[in-house]
Amino acid sequence: MSIKAFFVDFYGTIVHEDGEVIKKITKIICDTGKVEDPSEVDSFWWRDFQTMFMNSYGETFETQRSLEEKSLVHTLERFGSNADAKELSSMMFAHWIKPPIFEDSKPFFENSPLPVYVVSNIDTSDILQAIAYHDLHPAGVFTSEDAKSYKPGKELFELALRSAGLMPEEVIHIGDSVSSDVQGAAKAGIRALWLNRFGKSVPEGVESISELPEAFAFLSP
């Protein structure tokens, strides 16, 4: 069966992740709290967020904004910082709606011979603003908020398939996360390409590309 569409992740794939903003927030926490090693802040914050993230599903689902703000509050409390959680969160949210874009992203959308659907772990309002900000025109946008489930769960992929009227074998998914994108897509029976922009070691059995337009070569019979 021929490929009829691309699914693509957004943050880290089409646009830059919020790593630089997180560095700034971590520094503020270090400057206002009791921190011996800045890496401790990053580790605690990430683990706390991931714990809530993995338990956010169905009736217990919470938006990405809610999870980020809660994990930030927990991190401020853990390190005795008097910084304002809402103020720090707003720095992240500002990035989410106006993130810098990778140079190959617009050419990918403009030159793709197939429809491109965005499939992302993010709140719907934020990604729609980011897509409009960069004047991108995907065939559809599906978010964790829509599915009430985050990747690497298969629910978001299955929602995208149903909504687009596609079978798993008719889609190639592209994303920058081996766990969320490659393994998550596999759970839904979708072939995935790992977007390895930074030359990392490629895990065995994983198909990878270094730039988005390289995906077009995988459409050849």
Each language-model region and where it sits:
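N-terminal helical cap/lid subdomain that shapes the substrate entry/recognition surface
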Residues: 3-103
